[in-house]
Amino acid sequence: MTLDKGQKFSAKHGPNAQADPIIKDKVNKHAAQGKLPCAVAFKIADELEVSPAEIGKTADLLDLRLSKCQLGLFGYQPAKKAVKARAPENRQLEDAIRKALNDGKLACSDAWDIAGRFKVPKMAVSGACESLNIKIKPCQLGAF
């Protein structure tokens, strides 16, 4: 769901959505300047044994902006995006990306899995997707 200009992130979840108090407290402790970095969100999810989506939802309900996507897709300054298009390192990597596509898109979780399987940085996978004109969606945190 995209937001209209000036709309708060919490609007994505409806007026009755509530944040879990334990998650809310942990997210608030780690947020700085209205932002929560992707890596920190995943660390919190791991510590609390909840899904990354729960952390993303809580960040939304607190109207925090997610930053520094580990795939380099959003949250960087000044360009917003850190990833650069880069040809896949090998044919097997490209094949794995193409095999994991769903409706022409690669899920963020699949990008992470592929990076782990091939022992390459996450941005190597997202860079390959950029060069292949493949969108990465959905985000595990719910950013897109």
Could you tell me what each predicted segment is?
Residues M1-F144:
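Long, charge-rich, low-complexity intrinsically disordered regions
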